[in-house]
């Protein structure tokens, strides 16, 4: 069962995420170690928005609170009574989807993944607890393993040789592991690394093992489902966890063994065997950037309204390119690539940090294949 401190961490991380949505120095919010002070410093609009988010997470009407402590007490009581948390997908237009998970589902998932982490002595969390990935592996998993959790800011340049201990499970995300690999730091002994939220390049997984990582686990799942499958090595398909039943006919469907509702796999995938799958991913509609759901069509709509832009396309980078968005632009007459600066300035005023494309490519027409269909670049 969750404790009041667990609820406090969930709400504190949700608060930080709300503040980070509109700040260029987003990481500084997550380094802040006094969430009560962050709460007290909220503007009226920010507090109203956060109170709405908190209410939706615990399936309650939005309610005003004078302090973070009062909010924690109220929603801890709500959780004890209803046994439910809605995990919210982080939409880019202000709307989000509620993904309800009951305490039965939480317990089933935590116990269902437990066997993967035998020998773990401590969990080091680099991810927020209000998203399902962070919740499952840094809130619920420590309870079933009987180990402590330490939450640290995800700074690749930190002195990890001193911060980590043998037997640690480091719960991270693709961008952090990419930075680690680029820095070329060797891992301390007996470190287990975990990753989810978006696909990891096989070359990156191999590189982490070259840096003396003891064990790597990549989780495939979604906010709607929770953890579905895992893999440990490059070029492997994902093995489905035992608490899922799979129907591979036509569209791949799955359901929890404790439940009765079948649902379609959240991504396109192909089956290697009855319980092994290879996700093919979503590249155009909803993607994740640093753990936040981002919608490329929304970014395209904003970008297309700039007078310099005749046509544009926005996609998630391929794993070997990075973990941000990229944009392809066809310019109107009278504009050239030297106008990229004004386009960037315009976008920074309209988009969140996670929505901002990291790279821009220019050309006379949008990329298409021989059949005239849109293609990557």
PLM feature spans:
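Conserved adenylation A10 loop of the ANL superfamily
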Residues: 86-98, 223-224
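AMP-binding/adenylate-forming catalytic domain of the ANL superfamily
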Residues: 61-74, 351-373
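AMP-binding/adenylate-forming catalytic core of the ANL superfamily
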Residues: 266-355
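Phosphopantetheine-attachment site and its flanking helix in carrier
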Residues: 24-57
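AMP-binding/adenylate-forming
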Residues: 100-113, 122-179, 192
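Gly/Ser/Thr-rich phosphate-binding loop
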Residues: 181-236
């Amino acid at each position: 069962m969750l404790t009041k401190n667990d609820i406090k961490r969930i709400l504190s991380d949700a608060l930080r995420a709300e503040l980070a949505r509109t700040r260029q120095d987003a990481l500084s919010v997550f380094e802040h170690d006094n969430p009560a002070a962050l709460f007290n410093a909220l503007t009226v609009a920010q507090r109203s928005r956060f109170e709405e988010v908190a209410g939706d997470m615990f399936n309650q009407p939005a309610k005003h609170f004078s302090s973070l402590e009062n909010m924690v007490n109220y929603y801890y009581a709500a959780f004890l009574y209803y046994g439910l948390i809605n995990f919210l997908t982080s939409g880019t237009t202000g709307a989000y989807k509620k993904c309800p998970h009951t305490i039965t589902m939480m317990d089933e998932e935590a116990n269902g993944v437990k066997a993967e982490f035998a020998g773990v002595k401590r969990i080091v969390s680099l991810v927020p607890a209000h998203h399902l990935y962070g919740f499952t592996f840094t809130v619920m998993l420590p309870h079933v393993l009987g180990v402590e959790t330490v939450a640290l800011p995800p700074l690749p340049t930190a002195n990890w040789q001193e911060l980590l201990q043998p037997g640690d499970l480091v719960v991270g995300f693709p961008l952090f592991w990419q930075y680690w690999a680029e820095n070329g730091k060797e891992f301390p002994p007996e470190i287990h690394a975990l990753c989810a939220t978006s696909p990891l390049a096989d070359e990156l997984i191999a590189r982490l093992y070259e840096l003396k990582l003891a064990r790597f686990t990549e989780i495939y799942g979604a906010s709607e489902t929770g953890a579905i499958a895992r893999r440990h090595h490059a070029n492997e398909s994902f093995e489905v966890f035992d608490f899922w039943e799979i129907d591979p006919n036509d569209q791949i469907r799955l359901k929890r063994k404790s439940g009765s509702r079948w649902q379609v796999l959240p991504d396109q995938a192909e089956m290697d065997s009855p319980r092994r799958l290879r996700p093919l991913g979503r590249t155009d509609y909803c993607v994740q950037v640093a753990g936040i759901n981002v919608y490329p069509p929304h970014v395209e709509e904003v970008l297309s309204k700039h007078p310099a832009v005749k046509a544009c396309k926005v996609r998630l980078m391929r794993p070997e390119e990075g973990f941000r968005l990229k944009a392809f632009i066809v310019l109107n007459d009278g504009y050239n690539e030297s106008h990229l600066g004004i386009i960037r300035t315009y976008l920074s005023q309209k988009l969140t940090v996670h929505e901002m494309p990291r790279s821009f490519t220019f050309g006379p027409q949008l990329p298409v294949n021989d059949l005239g269909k849109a293609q990557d670049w």
